[in-house]
C-alpha cells in the first residue's frame, strides 16, 4: 500500500476527512489518523487494519487496555495513549447520551451502551448504571473484572456503591466471554440476591443484562426480575 503522503492529495485520509467529513473514511483510515505514522514496512493505514483484524473490529478494540495496546509491535506509549484516549472519549460520549434522557425510556440505548462496553472483552466484567428517582443516569462504574469464567461481585459492595452515589435504582450488566448470552443458574441466583440486598435500602434493581458478542439479553424482559 502506498504511503498516505504518496497518494494524490484528494485521496489522502486527512484531506478526504476535511473535504467530505469523517464518515467518508474507513475505520482503518480513521485509526491511521490517530496513529499518525506507521513503522518500517507498514503504513499507519496498515496498522489500523491490523488492529481491527486482531480485535475483531472496533468493539473489540474498545475493550483493549493501554498496556495491551503497547504490547503490540509498533505501538509505543504515545500511539497507545492516543488510541486509549480516543476510545475513552467515545465511551464517555455514549454515556453522555444516556445522561440526557431517562435511562429506561430508551432501553435500546442502554443495550447499545453495554454492548459497546462489553461485547469483545476477553474476561468477565460487571458494570452498573446508577440512576436517580426519575431514572436519569447519575454515573456508571465497573464493579468487578474477573477471570475468563467469572467476576466476583458481592451484594454489600454494590449496595455501598449505590448509596455512595445516592442512587434510587440500578441497572447491572456483565458479559459472557464463552459466547452464550443466556442467563445461567448462577446469574439467576446472583440477580435474586442482589435484588433482595438493594431492596433492604429501598433501591430498585431495574434490570440485569448479559452481553455475549452481538447479543444482549435482558433478565427483566425474561421475567426474571
Curated annotation (Swiss-Prot):
The keyword Cell wall biogenesis/degradation does not apply. Disulfide bonds: none annotated. GO terms for molecular function: metal ion binding; metallopeptidase activity. One of its GO terms (biological process) is proteolysis. Residues 103-225 form the MPN domain. Coiled coil: none annotated. Gene3D superfamilies: 5' to 3' exonuclease, C-terminal subdomain, Cytidine Deaminase, domain 2. Zn(2+) binds at residues 174, 176, 187. It holds the Pfam family UPF0758_N. SUPFAM superfamilies: JAB1/MPN domain (SSF102712), RuvA domain 2-like (SSF47781). Transmembrane segments: none annotated. A motif (JAMM motif) lies at residues 174-187. InterPro entries: MPN, RadC_JAB, RuvA_2-like, UPF0758, UPF0758_CS, UPF0758_N. Keywords: Hydrolase, Metal-binding, Metalloprotease, Protease, Zinc. Belongs to the UPF0758 family. This is UPF0758 protein Bpet3149. It comes from Bordetella petrii (strain ATCC BAA-461 / DSM 12804 / CCUG 43448).
Amino acid at each position: 500500500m502506498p504511503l498516505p503522503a504518496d497518494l494524490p492529495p484528494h485521496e489522502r485520509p486527512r484531506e478526504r476527512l476535511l473535504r467530505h467529513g469523517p464518515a467518508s473514511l474507513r475505520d482503518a483510515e480513521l485509526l491511521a489518523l490517530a496513529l499518525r505514522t506507521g513503522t518500517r514496512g507498514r503504513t499507519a493505514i496498515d496498522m489500523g487494519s491490523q488492529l481491527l483484524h486482531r480485535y475483531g473490529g472496533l468493539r473489540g478494540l474498545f475493550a483493549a487496555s493501554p498496556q495491551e495496546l503497547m504490547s503490540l509491535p509498533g505501538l509505543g506509549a504515545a500511539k497507545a495513549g492516543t488510541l486509549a484516549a480516543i476510545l475513552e472519549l467515545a465511551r464517555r460520549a455514549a454515556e453522555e447520551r444516556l445522561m440526557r434522557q431517562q435511562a429506561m425510556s430508551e432501553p435500546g440505548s442502554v443495550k447499545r451502551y453495554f454492548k459497546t462496553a462489553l461485547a469483545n472483552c476477553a474476561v468477565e466484567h460487571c458494570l452498573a448504571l446508577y440512576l436517580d428517582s426519575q431514572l436519569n443516569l447519575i454515573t456508571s462504574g465497573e464493579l468487578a473484572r474477573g477471570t475468563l469464567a467469572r467476576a466476583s461481585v458481592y451484594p454489600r459492595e454494590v449496595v455501598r456503591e449505590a448509596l455512595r452515589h445516592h442512587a434510587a435504582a440500578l441497572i447491572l450488566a456483565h458479559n459472557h466471554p464463552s459466547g452464550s448470552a443466556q442467563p445461567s443458574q448462577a446469574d439467576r441466583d446472583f440477580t435474586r440476591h442482589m435484588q433482595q440486598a438493594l431492596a433492604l435500602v429501598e433501591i430498585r434493581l431495574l434490570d440485569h443484562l448479559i452481553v455475549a458478542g452481538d447479543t444482549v439479553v435482558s433478565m427483566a424482559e425474561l421475567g426474571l426480575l
